[in-house]
Swiss-Prot record:
Organism lineage: Eukaryota, Metazoa, Chordata, Craniata, Vertebrata
Record-given protein name: Polyisoprenoid diphosphate/phosphate phosphohydrolase PLPP6
Active-site residue numbers: H212 (proton donors), H254 (nucleophile)
Residue span of region Phosphatase sequence motif III: 247-258
Membrane topology: Multi-pass membrane protein
């Protein structure tokens, strides 16, 4: 009697695919019992009752064959999702404003370095550096504050005191606004600058905007509007303001944009002072207290 331990095809485990043994199902031998056993095996394979048959059908399925390769199973987990079209457009096409600002900054740094011919004693115009530093002192806030206070104390006319008091107000406003903007922006001074400036404060380590440029524009506009000067003197005042701003770049103290914005800020500061002009009519208490000194 044949052993009931058979494969799915009904062959004995020890038989080869090309040989047949008498009495086996291939030769029709073995009686009806072996035929019924083979028929029941086939039925169990079709119904999925046998776990071995279930594994065989799963291994023959197309899904299992596709997943049997490790690369095919790993690919869906490794491939990152493609970015949305709008995100890719933002990365590849930066805004026009950003490109313009970066280009302006690059030109500003390049031009400031080219114009810094007096930044050190070994620079191209290093011999002119003492003269530039003297011009630097002429635009410093301390000499202007002390000079305005001295003239205010020596003045004996109401009109002169009114002009000088508003000049003092303008200088204090300039110092306050420049200090606030420098503290907010915190732009470092150029790398080729030497920190040998006259009477510096904590905010003076920052360069934007140029306090000398704001003061030069403010004082020049103030003088031209409230002092009667001959034409050569008026030209000299404008020339002083321009050369003072240029000297800030030549000494390496500031970049070109620091000075340009400083001129604009100083020009607008005078508009504020002119709008808030102090006079005996709007602030009589201030002038009365000053006259009692």
């Amino acid at each position: 009697m044949p052993s009931p331990r058979r494969t799915i095809e009904g062959r004995p485990l020890g038989s080869s695919g090309g040989s047949s043994v008498p009495g086996s199902p291939a030769h029709g031998g073995g009686g009806g019992g072996s035929g019924r056993f083979e028929f029941q095996s086939l039925l169990s394979c079709r119904s999925g009752a046998d776990p071995a048959c279930a594994r065989l059908r799963a291994s023959d399925s197309p899904v299992h064959r596709r997943g049997s390769f490790p690369l095919a199973a790993a690919c869906p987990a490794q491939v990152a999702p493609a970015p949305p079209p709008e995100d890719a457009g933002m990365n590849l096409n930066p805004s026009f404003l950003g490109i313009a600002l970066r280009s302006l900054l690059a030109i500003d740094l390049w031009l400031s370095k080219k114009l810094g011919v007096c930044a050190g004693e070994s620079s191209a115009w290093g011999s002119v550096r003492p003269l530039m530093k003297l011009l630097e002192i002429s635009g410093h806030g301390i000499p202007w504050l002390l000079g305005t206070l001295y003239c205010l104390l020596r003045s004996d006319s109401w009109a002169g005191r009114e002009v000088l008091m508003n000049l003092l107000f303008a200088l204090l406003l300039d110092l306050l606004l420049v200090a606030v903007i420098k503290g907010l922006v915190r732009r470092r001074r150029p790398a080729h600058n030497q920190m040998d400036m006259f009477f510096t404060l904590s905010v003076d380590k920052y360069s934007f905007p140029s306090g000398h440029a704001t003061r030069a524009a403010l004082v020049s506009r103030f003088i031209l509007n409230h002092l009667v000067l001959a034409i050569p003197l008026r030209v000299l005042v404008v020339l002083w303001a321009f050369v003072l701003g240029l000297s800030r770049v030549m000494l390496g103290r500031h970049n070109v944009t620091d000075v340009a914005f400083g001129f604009f800020l100083g020009y607008m500061q005078y508009s504020i002072v002119d709008y808030c002009w102090l006079s005996p009519l709007n602030v009589p208490v201030l002038f009365v207290l000053w006259n009692q000194q």
